[in-house]
Amino acid sequence: ILVRHGQSIWNKERRFTGWADVDLTEQGKLEAKKAGTLIKSQKIEFDAYFTSCLKRANNSLEIILKILNKNDANIIKSKSLNERHYGGLTSLNKDETIKKFGIQQVKIWRRSFDVAPPAMEDTHPYKNKINSSIASESLKDTFKRVVPYFDKNIKPLIKLKKNILIVFHGNSCRALLMKIFNISKEKIIDFEIPTGNPLLIKFEDNLKVKSYKYLDPTRSKKIIFNA
């Protein structure tokens, strides 16, 4: 099961978040609780729990685990599952950024596969808080860290028929779904991940997708096979 974290404060304020470590809103906490309830209804016994190193994902997972009565679960955290680094756009309001650069340019920065936003300069107010040698990431850059991590650490567990829960971010999830569903870089531009809506994916023995569904069908997004 894959879950994008519940709504964060900057999601609500329509600000580019990336590697900035912001909290969940009250709505985001409710979304995580609902996700936990939906997951519990599936009666799945999980063997491993993965998340990023950012607290909006960590806290979403903790809320879900409370619903599942798994407060002592062994959680595996990795920066490889972090949100895409939004570079110089970090903390900027999306609507104001559109006014400044135009909707097409912002869409390319947000949704294209291989175009990174402007680099985060040393003078950026979040440079020291994020403290990363990475200045900006395209979805391709995110793909290059998420997919190898999945292949090395998670795919072997799936081969052993283990049940896995991953709580992470919109773009790291988009990158992984590109791999799992063979979504093209042209199609991924219009592909969005809803917050707090668990995506249940079942695999064949050869790791081909057997079936998939969002557990809350009222907030589902279509996934495109072989696009």
Please give the residue ranges for each predicted region:
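Amphipathic, non-transmembrane alpha-helical scaffold segments
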Residues: 25, 29, 50, 54, ...
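Phosphate-coordination/substrate-recognition cap region in phosphate-metabolizing enzymes
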Residues: 35-123, 178-202, 226-227
